[in-house]
Every structure is written in C-alpha cells, then in structure tokens.
Amino acid sequence: MPRKTLTELAQNPDLIPGIYNYCDRWCERCPLTSGCLVYTTESDPTDNNDTLNHDVRNAVFWQTLSETLAEVRQLIPEWAKDALNLNHPPKQKTITRQRNVDNHPLTKAGKQYANNASDWFRKLDLDSDPPSTSAKCGSEVARQNPQPFDDAREVIQWYQYQIAVKTMRALSGRKEEIEDPETADFPKDSDGSAKVALIGIDRSIAAWRLMQLSLPDCAESIVPLILQLETLRISLEQSFPEARAFIRPGFDSIPPA
C-alpha cells in the first residue's frame, strides 16, 4: 500500500492537533503516539494495532513511575533536613531583557544537575561489570532483576540534559512574552516549556528512587541528586507559577468550569 501524503495523514480525525508542541520527544515511551501526526509520519502505516498496544504499555509504565514519585515525596523532607531548606530556596528574579538566559540561575542549576548525574554514572560504570546491568554497590540486586535498573537509567539519562534545555526555552519564551504584550491573553509558551521541564524533573526523581532500590548500597550517594532536582523543581515553580496548570494538547485534560 502506498504511503499516505502528509496532507492525507493530517485529515485523520483521531490525531490531536499540536500534541507534539509540548512533549519530551520520547516517542518510544509516549502513551499517545496514536494521536500524533509526527509519530504517524515516521511509523509503519500497517502497524496500527502495534501502536495502540505500544501506547497502553507506556501508559502503565508512566503510571508505575508516578506511584514511585508519590513514595519518594514522603522521603525527601527527611533527607533534606540536614542538607538544605527546601521550603525556602532562593527566589528567582523575573527575567529582564538584558538578562542572559544562559547565565540564569535556573539554567545553571539544570546544567549542574546534568553534570552531577554524569559524574555519578561515570563512577558507577567504573565500578561495574558489566556497567549496563549491575554495579559494585548492590550489584546482586541489580543482577537478579536488572529491568528496574535499566528502566531507571533510561529515564534519568533521557531527561538529564533536557531539563536544562526546556528550562532555557521557558526563560527565553518569557523574555519574548514580556517584549510582546499582545500575547498576554493567550496561554504562555513559556509555561508550557516550564511544565515539560517540571515533568522531566518529576520523572527523574522517581527514576532515581528506582535506582536506589536497585542499588541499595548506592542509595546514600543518590540523595544529593534527588535533593538537587527537588530544589530546582521548587525554584522553577516559583518562577513559573502557572506552569503546572498549563494544558498540553492531548496530555492534559481541561478542568470542568
């Protein structure tokens, strides 16, 4: 069967307009690929049933990770007690025209986390044999059941750099919104980008918790990374207070009036 043109594909009523504007570009883990024009143009047109099964599997995966996030939220206050005051992180100033997005504290915090995560995995891999499935600290747990370890690593490394990138997009977008007051009555692109960054932070925190459970002897060394993400989350929410309420096409339901 000949491949459909982009115009023909776009006429599919099951597609969700604009769903790809505020996603994390992780098609392999997306639960809504059946409604995405971008995914449809890149996938095999004969695999419709497989696409639906793919979406169901991914929905279950993210629901499980969401439950892990709820668990780790209960642990963070105890971990943070002697490390830092998460209730009162430094407040972020509103970005101005002169402020360089690259040098914004939120950007720096996102990049610093990415570097620290790289350092952690580098040390882990030096102590591991093989590095993809087990590690010196708690290697027996990971060796007996490698899937949680592999899933956690995959999630962490997917969002590792994206958090800073999406944060920078949010900061840059807000700068443009300040300069163009005509956009004031519309949903803010900066809030949408900030929400994607926040979701990346949430999922990374949950994945680090899975890593703790897979590598119990490494659990303590993971705590600073979780606290770093939690501090960034709070600061980002302070800087973009409407971000969590932003409605992403397809991913978020519109609350009843």
Where are these regions (language model features)?
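N-terminal cysteine/histidine-rich coordination modules
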Residues: M1-Q74
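Metal-dependent nuclease catalytic cores that hydrolyze phosphodiester bonds in DNA/RNA
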Residues: E42-T46, L52-G110, N116, W120
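Hydrophobic, aromatic-lined core segments that form the binding pocket/scaffold
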Residues: N85-A257
